[in-house]
């Protein structure tokens, strides 16, 4: 008699995805972030659902409802801070996951990679809209500044911005629609994640060496289920340390002041995970140019597979490309720092240089270094 997990239509899908899935025997801890992203998504949906039960999407009561959740709702404070810091953990895992894909050449699975880029954009949109909901000063002004960027689009820009706002400024209509979108998008993300996995399981996972591993596969369970549980425990530990000891570490103090359209904060900035893109946006004096650079800073990931010149897939045995990769990581950290600084000397110059380096590494230096390494190996 066949085991029920191999015959039952639903159990079969789970079995082929998480139990009997053939996985390379040498994938490292860098392959843990996919499952951690799944856990983050589930955590965000659950905590978000409980927050939505008490939140009111109205400009008059939104700020008070968040205060009410923290003060009066049973364990409301922990749900709120798990949701806010859970977003930070989500982005840490996302950046690690994308970085792993770039380092080990996983982008050669083009369908999986492109769905991943779509997922990244969707998660960023969701996080941005979520940041607007508490209706603090930074929520309001962040929404005003970022949505206003669309006015740089020639001819239709102004109409587009007013259409998104639902009026002539960020107001009740904007908050209501942002709440509606923030609620629905995580479910769209879940569907996209399922498609992402579907395409991944068509080809099988990549591995650190970048070599086809069909001759050396092991079952996902118990080897990688146990390994993923270790990653999960470390994720929960980090999240709970943040939530219970310094919940406001990654937030902005300005967001504890209710939104006031008559008073602009001295320095408007988004959450930390958008600062690198914000720094690239600010480094270009022209509005339309800045918006294009902002979009391209993420969209550039889509052309990375086309710029792969090396005859090796992974960077594991390519020391020159490794140096360049870590230089890129340092550059992104510099951009993140600059994004949080005021627009004054010397930060403007540092931001402009870091932005030039960012695009130069990805568009020019990476392909050149790949070719040099081929020549060094006489390929």
Swiss-Prot record:
Protein localization: Mitochondrion inner membrane
Transmembrane segments: 33-53, 77-98, 113-133, 178-198, 226-246, 288-308, 320-340, 347-367
Entry superkingdom: Eukaryota
InterPro entries xref list: Cyt_b/b6_C, Cyt_b/b6_C_sf, Cyt_b/b6_N, Cytb/b6-like_sf, Cytochrome_b, Cytochrome_b_C_euk/bac, Cytochrome_b_N_euk/bac, Di-haem_cyt_TM
A GO biological process held by the record: mitochondrial electron transport, ubiquinol to cytochrome c
Residues given in the record as heme b b566 binding sites: 97, 196
Cofactor comment text: Binds 2 heme b groups non-covalently.
Binding site for heme b b562: 83, 182
GO cellular component, one term: respiratory chain complex III
Keyword terms of this UniProt record: Electron transport, Heme, Iron, Membrane, Metal-binding, Mitochondrion, Mitochondrion inner membrane, Respiratory chain, Transmembrane, Transmembrane helix, Transport, Ubiquinone
One term of GO molecular function: ubiquinol-cytochrome-c reductase activity
Binding site for a ubiquinone: 201
Membrane topology: Multi-pass membrane protein
Pfam families named in the record: Cytochrom_B_C, Cytochrome_B
Cofactor: heme b
Gene3D superfamilies xref list: Cytochrome Bc1 Complex, Chain C
Subunit organization: The cytochrome bc1 complex contains 11 subunits: 3 respiratory subunits (MT-CYB, CYC1 and UQCRFS1), 2 core proteins (UQCRC1 and UQCRC2) and 6 low-molecular weight proteins (UQCRH/QCR6, UQCRB/QCR7, UQCRQ/QCR8, UQCR10/QCR9, UQCR11/QCR10 and a cleavage product of UQCRFS1). This cytochrome bc1 complex then forms a dimer.
Family under the similarity heading: Belongs to the cytochrome b family.
Other facts: Heme 1 (or BL or b562) is low-potential and absorbs at about 562 nm, and heme 2 (or BH or b566) is high-potential and absorbs at about 566 nm.
Known function: Component of the ubiquinol-cytochrome c reductase complex (complex III or cytochrome b-c1 complex) that is part of the mitochondrial respiratory chain. The b-c1 complex mediates electron transfer from ubiquinol to cytochrome c. Contributes to the generation of a proton gradient across the mitochondrial membrane that is then used for ATP synthesis.
PANTHER family linked to this entry: CYTOCHROME B (PTHR19271:SF16)
Protein name: Cytochrome b
Species whose genome carries this gene: Viverra zibetha (Large Indian civet)
Classification of source organism: Eukaryota, Metazoa, Chordata, Craniata, Vertebrata
């Amino acid at each position: 008699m066949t085991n029920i997990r191999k015959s039952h239509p639903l159990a079969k899908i789970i079995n082929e995805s998480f139990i009997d899935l053939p996985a390379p025997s040498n994938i490292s801890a860098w392959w843990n972030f996919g499952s951690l992203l799944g856990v983050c998504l589930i955590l965000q949906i659950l905590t978000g659902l409980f927050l939505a039960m008490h939140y009111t999407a109205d400009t008059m009561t939104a700020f008070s409802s968040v205060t009410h959740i923290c003060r009066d709702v049973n364990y409301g404070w922990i749900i709120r801070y798990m949701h806010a810091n859970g977003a930070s953990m989500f982005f840490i895992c996302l950046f690690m996951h994308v970085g792993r894909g770039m380092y080990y050449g996983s982008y050669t699975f083009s369908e999986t990679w492109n769905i991943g880029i779509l997922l990244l954009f969707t998660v960023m949109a969701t996080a941005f809209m979520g940041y607007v909901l508490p209706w603090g000063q930074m929520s309001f002004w962040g929404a005003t500044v970022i949505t206003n960027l669309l006015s740089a689009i020639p001819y239709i820009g102004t109409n587009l911005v007013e259409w998104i706002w639902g009026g002539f400024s960020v107001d009740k209509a904007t908050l209501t629609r942002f709440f509606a979108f923030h609620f629905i998008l995580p479910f769209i993300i879940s569907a996209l994640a399922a498609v992402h996995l579907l395409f991944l399981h068509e080809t099988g996972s990549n591995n650190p060496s970048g070599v086809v591993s069909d001759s050396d596969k092991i079952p996902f369970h118990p080897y990688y289920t146990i390994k993923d549980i270790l990653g999960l425990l470390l994720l929960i530990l980090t999240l709970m340390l943040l939530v219970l000891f310094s919940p406001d570490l990654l937030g902005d103090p300005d967001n504890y002041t209710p939104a006031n359209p008559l008073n602009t904060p001295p320095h408007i900035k988004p959450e930390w995970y958008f600062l690198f893109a914000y720094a690239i946006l600010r480094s270009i004096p022209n509005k339309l140019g800045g918006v294009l650079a902002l979009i391209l800073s993420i969209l550039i990931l889509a052309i990375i597979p086309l710029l792969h010149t090396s005859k090796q897939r992974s960077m594991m045995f390519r020391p020159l490309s490794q140096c360049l990769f870590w230089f890129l990581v340092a550059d992104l950290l510099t951009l993140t720092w600059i994004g949080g600084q005021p627009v004054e000397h010397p930060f403007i110059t540092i931001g402009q240089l870091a932005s030039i380096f960012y695009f130069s590494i990805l568009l020019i230096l990476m392909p050149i270094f790949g070719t040099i390494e081929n020549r060094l190996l006489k390929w």
